[in-house]
């Protein structure tokens, strides 16, 4: 069976992470989100998978290649051009990407599934396809019910009593929402649906194609299913995903490594004298990381591989990516550290290098950074990283 993973977006709402990592490659405890999707697809018999790529396409292609080591076949559709010797992505939209593939050569010749490349799911795809076919649908959206107070964060789907889609509401105010069913970005299509997508232009599934299907009166349905769905569309979403995995609220992701203390998991060759470290799980620490004496770590927290957490530092409810160095005495509370950026839970970021705060946070591969006199502006910024 055939499927498509949408992986061409720039991921602007997950910046600064997506400056160097495309959204499908964002790691959940060192494993890219898209790898979980491939495992799910393979489990349900989808072994021919098309992936549209654009932003940082080479990162996705070089990791997954032709899919052999994941037990599937993968091919890529690049959206963009070479301009002045540089590869420049230009995404065609979620529907435009489908059209490009089908016009190249009719790949989709039977019922197929489309997944967004930035979500963790454990959906029973076999049952979903069965329900789609039973309804005689040309297109089906998998929906999920959320509490009324959360509908304003999602695209709301409004249906009749038989599940046929009547209209959509994009992030409506709570009091204006006509439904609590939301679009999860999981779709089941018949090949004929691609005939409704125009050629050679940017075209979106939700904003363009779906309203056209409704207006045309086509058999377009929503199927509401109960499953685990963790969207990673924004920095706060990613934060919650990591917390959910560490706290075992997300059941379909296992914590890797070995448990060295209750609730404390590590990769191989972590250098730490646990008797001289105050640590409270759940915590994951990647391999080849050094934790110096006097460090305090409070979970849920994740420290990536090849990091250095210096003496007296505090890591509290935080996520630290690989090759990060947290300086002596630094206090990191409710923060995400990615390269030269320190990000809070709302997504607001500080460029620690531009702020000359590399004595506090830097790349662990640099030579040791010495403490130096701070300027007032630096002191004010550092307070954001070291809340009381």
Curated annotation (Swiss-Prot):
Protein's recorded name: UTP--glucose-1-phosphate uridylyltransferase
Cofactor: Mg(2+)
Binding site for Mg(2+): 118
Note: The CugP-type UDP-Glc PPase appears to be present in all cyanobacteria, whereas the GalU-type UDP-Glc PPase is present in only certain cyanobacterial species. Moreover, the GalU-type PPase is found to be widely distributed throughout the bacterial kingdom, whereas the CugP-type can be found in only very limited species other than cyanobacteria.
Assigned protein family: Belongs to the CugP-type UDP-glucose pyrophosphorylase family.
Function: Catalyzes the formation of UDP-glucose, from UTP and glucose 1-phosphate. Is highly specific since it cannot use other NTPs such as dTTP, CTP, ATP, and GTP, and other sugar-1P such as GlcNAc-1P, Gal-1P, and Man-1P, as substrates. Has probably a central and essential role as the substrate supplier for galactolipid synthesis; galactolipids are major constituents of the photosynthetic thylakoid membrane and important for photosynthetic activity.
HAMAP family: CugP_cyano (MF_02085)
GO biological process entries: biosynthetic process; UDP-alpha-D-glucose metabolic process
PANTHER family: SUGAR-1-PHOSPHATE GUANYL TRANSFERASE (PTHR22572)
Keywords: Magnesium, Metal-binding, Nucleotidyltransferase, Transferase
Enzyme category, top tier: transferase
Gene name of the record: cugP
Gene Ontology CC: cytoplasm
E.C. no: 2.7.7.9
Phenotype seen when the gene is deleted: Complete disruption of this gene could not be achieved, suggesting that the CugP-type UDP-Glc PPase is essential for growth and survival of Synechocystis.
Catalytic activity: alpha-D-glucose 1-phosphate + UTP + H(+) = UDP-alpha-D-glucose + diphosphate
GO MF entries: magnesium ion binding; nucleotidyltransferase activity; UTP binding; UTP:glucose-1-phosphate uridylyltransferase activity
């Amino acid at each position: 069976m055939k499927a498509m993973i949408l992986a061409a977006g720039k991921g602007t709402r997950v910046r600064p992470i997506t400056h160097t990592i495309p959204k499908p490659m964002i790691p959940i405890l060192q494993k890219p989100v898209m790898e979980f999707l491939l495992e799910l697809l393979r489990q349900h018999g989808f072994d021919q998978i098309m992936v549209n790529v654009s932003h940082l396409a080479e990162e996705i292609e070089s990791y997954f290649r032709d899919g052999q080591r994941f037990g599937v076949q993968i091919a890529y559709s690049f959206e963009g051009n070479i301009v002045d010797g540089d590869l420049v992505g230009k995404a065609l939209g979620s529907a435009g990407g489908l059209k490009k593939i089908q016009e190249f050569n009719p790949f989709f010749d039977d019922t197929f599934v489309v997944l967004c490349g930035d979500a963790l799911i454990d959906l029973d795809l076999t049952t979903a396809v069965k329900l789609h076919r039973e309804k005689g649908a040309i297109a089906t959206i998998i929906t999920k019910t959320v509490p009324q107070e959360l509908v304003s964060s999602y695209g709301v789907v409004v249906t009749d009593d038989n599940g046929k889609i009547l209209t959509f509401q994009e992030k409506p105010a709570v009091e204006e929402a006509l439904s609590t069913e939301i679009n999860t970005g999981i779709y089941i299509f018949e090949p004929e649906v691609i005939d409704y997508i125009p050629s050679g232009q940017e075209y979106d599934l939700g904003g363009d194609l779906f309203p056209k299907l409704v207006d045309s009166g086509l058999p377009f349905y929503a199927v509401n299913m109960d499953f685990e769905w963790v969207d990673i569309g924004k920095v706060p979403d990613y934060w919650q995903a990591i917390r959910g995995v560490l706290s075992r609220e997300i059941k379909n992701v296992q914590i890797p490594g070995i448990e060295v203390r209750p609730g404390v998991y590590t990769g191989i060759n972590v250098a730490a004298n646990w008797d001289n470290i105050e640590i409270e799980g759940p915590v994951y620490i990647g391999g080849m990381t050094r934790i110096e004496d006097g460090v305090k770590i409070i979970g849920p927290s994740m420290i990536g591989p090849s990091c250095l957490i210096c003496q007296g530092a505090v890591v509290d409810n935080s996520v630290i990516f690989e090759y990060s160095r947290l300086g002596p005495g630094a206090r990191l509370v409710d923060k995400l550290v990615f390269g030269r950026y320190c990000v809070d839970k709302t997504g607001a970021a500080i460029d620690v290098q531009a702020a000359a705060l590399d004595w506090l946070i830097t790349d662990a591969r640099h030579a040791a950074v010495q403490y130096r006199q701070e300027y007032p502006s630096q002191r004010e910024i550092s307070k954001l990283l070291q809340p009381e």
